[in-house]
Curated annotation (Swiss-Prot):
Belongs to the ABC transporter superfamily. Methionine importer (TC 3.A.1.24) family. Keywords: Amino-acid transport, ATP-binding, Cell membrane, Membrane, Nucleotide-binding, Translocase, Transport. This is Methionine import ATP-binding protein MetN. Pfam families: ABC_tran. Its main location: membrane. Residues 2-237 form the ABC transporter domain. The lineage of its organism: Bacteria, Bacillati, Actinomycetota, Actinomycetes, Mycobacteriales. It comes from Mycobacterium sp. (strain MCS). It catalyses: L-methionine(out) + ATP + H2O = L-methionine(in) + ADP + phosphate + H(+); D-methionine(out) + ATP + H2O = D-methionine(in) + ADP + phosphate + H(+). Part of the ABC transporter complex MetNIQ involved in methionine import. Responsible for energy coupling to the transport system. It is found in: Cell membrane. The complex is composed of two ATP-binding proteins (MetN), two transmembrane proteins (MetI) and a solute-binding protein (MetQ). GO terms for molecular function: ABC-type D-methionine transporter activity; ATP binding; ATP hydrolysis activity.
Amino acid sequence: MIEIDNLTKRFGDRTVLDDISLSVGAGEILAVVGPSGAGKSTLSRCVSFLERPTSGSVRVDGADFTRLEGDALIAARRKIGVIFQTAPLLRRRTVAQNVALPLEYLRATDDSVSRRVTELLDRVGLRDRSGYHPAQLSGGQRQRVGIARALALGPSVLLSDEATSGLDPATTKSILALLSHLREDFGLSIILITHEMEVVREIADSVARIDDGRIVESGSVTDVILDPTSALARELLPERPSVPVRGDAEVWEVSHASRHVPLDWLTSIQSVPGISGVQVDVLSASVEAIRGVAVGRAVLAISPAAPPGFADHLSARGLHVTSTAATARKTAA
């Protein structure tokens, strides 16, 4: 488990991180997102103690890194494995030799190194590439070697700093599946620093958005997405292109605000007394499963004569309804 409490980092008079507090339990994945320059990379360096925070604490399995110095800090940092955007592999070393590097620094026995390297290459699906050199590997395979090396010393926390950036979609998906399996197998606490919202949707249990060095929004991924007021939810579920509105219809945006929205919420309108005559046109809609919960958003064109009970009916079924000005969305007939 990793706990970050009131972490602040300053460079001279400039505050880059301001009072950051986050926690990730064993077997959990937290995604940290935000625009370029928001402080994500500095947070990564402070968590791994490549940079010492100005104030606050970073505790891993109860050990407060900010209270440690010298050899004690070096030993404690072994509890955090780091995966970088580009795996920094030594080109003259084989795959197995690259994975073995941290163990060799600790002067582990040859037998223990061999066993550990074989186990890790099995885990990342590269045992048959153990004698290859980095130049003989694909980008995804090199990243798998980096993951294996990050796990060599048996960390309890894995920090991924834009590890899937630049990979093609299929390779990204396979790397995320690997990380998900590893967190289950080893009980890892994983922090994903990323700008890719599909990564958050695919694998994260919780998410925090940093902007200008501060956390502006955080929570479980499903809770964030089901919050109709969340700006982060709109990034996680971007709007789909809509069919233009014609005539004098009113535009409503309908989004899931509950884990229990019935699948027939739209078709059921036709059977509700006093509402069945409402003309409803679907301009756009999307539904997907995230962490086992169906979430979605639809843009509807509603006839002007829609009774107040129509919105109440949708709200009662776990939906959030926002009426927007139709004029901006209309096109000439």
